């Protein structure tokens, strides 16, 4: 139909239209504040994301070709473990997935209660994020090989698996189309899943500049949210207008370049500039015995020396 063609084929009007809708939804959530906006919607969206993802994984794993994808995902190729490009890509993915280096964790961390055990909270956030990423792999990689079983091309000219926008907007839609009637429901559920994941990420990203404007410059939250939202939409529109040139470039520069470097600067600030005793007193408010535990014996040295050195070394090897 004309609607399905409009949704699946590349269209500038569609891209800018959905960008506007997406920014509008994000602005509505952020303008409502922390409790009525971020907390309320995150508590609704995250369980929905888990349920949808698990349901899709179960369905995809029952399809022909899924086991080949599962082997491709879970059986490691140790010959590539020292590849600088792979390490930089993995580091970029980790920084992007955890929203490190962009202020999100700092802002969200400032909203939790003072009596929270920060090392435990940090570990739980990392565990949850890694679990979601692992589940996403259990869905996407088997789905790619199910698509191959249906006659869809899944390898690029270079011999690597198709990834990025081409995977989402070409390979997977072709898979859903090949599934017949079931593909309509699976495809709809998959893109709802993608939208939920994107919204939960975008609200955390937008909260950073909004929080700064509200706290540092005393700007009204509603005004700050709409103003910054308009700036984000303008940048998004510029990327849509020059999609082939800018999209991959922006992804590479932000996740593989800017975020690791910014995270290294955060490590330097936390390890060398910020008073160690101030950090310890903050940690003690949630865990009075933290000073005598393994965390405090390792963390200061790790952040001060190892993290910046490893990030810089890995970053340098990527060139």
Which residue ranges define each predicted feature?
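Membrane-interface loop-to-helix entry segments
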Residues: 17-59, 255
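Inter-helical loop and helix-membrane interface segments of multi-pass membrane transporters/permeases
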Residues: 1-35, 67-88, 162-169, 182, ...
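Membrane-embedded translocation segments of transport machinery
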Residues: 39, 43-199, 223-224
């Amino acid at each position: 139909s004309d609607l399905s063609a409009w949704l699946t084929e590349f269209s500038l009007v569609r891209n800018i239209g959905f960008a506007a809708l997406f920014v509008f939804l994000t602005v509505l959530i952020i303008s409502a504040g922390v409790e009525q906006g971020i907390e309320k919607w995150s508590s609704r969206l995250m369980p929905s994301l888990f349920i949808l993802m698990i349901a899709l994984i179960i369905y995809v794993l029952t399809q022909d070709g899924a086991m080949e994808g599962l082997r491709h995902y879970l059986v490691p190729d140790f010959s590539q473990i020292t590849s600088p490009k792979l390490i930089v890509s993995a580091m970029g993915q980790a920084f992007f997935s955890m929203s490190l280096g962009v202020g999100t964790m700092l802002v969200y961390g400032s909203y939790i209660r003072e009596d929270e055990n920060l090392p435990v909270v940090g570990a739980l956030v990392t565990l949850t994020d890694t679990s979601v990423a692992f589940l996403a792999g259990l869905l996407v990689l088997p789905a790619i090989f199910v698509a191959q079983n249906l006659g869809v091309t899944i390898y690029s000219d270079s011999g690597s698996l198709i990834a990025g926008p081409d995977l989402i907007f070409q390979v997977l839609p072709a898979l859903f189309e090949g599934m017949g009637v079931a593909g309509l429901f699976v495809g709809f559920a998959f893109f709802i899943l993608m939208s939920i994941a994107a919204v939960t990420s975008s609200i955390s990203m937008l909260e950073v500049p909004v929080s700064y404007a509200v706290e540092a410059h005393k700007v009204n939250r509603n005004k700050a949210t709409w103003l910054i939202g308009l700036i984000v939409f303008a940048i998004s529109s510029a990327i849509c207008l020059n999609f082939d040139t800018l999209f991959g470039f922006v992804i590479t520069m932000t996740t593989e370049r800017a975020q690791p470097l910014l995270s290294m600067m955060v490590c330097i600030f936390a390890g060398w500039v910020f008073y160690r005793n101030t950090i310890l007193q903050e940690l003690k408010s949630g865990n009075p015995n933290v000073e005598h535990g393994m965390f405090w014996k390792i963390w200061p040295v790790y952040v001060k020396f190892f993290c910046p050195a490893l990030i810089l070394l890995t970053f340098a090897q990527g060139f």
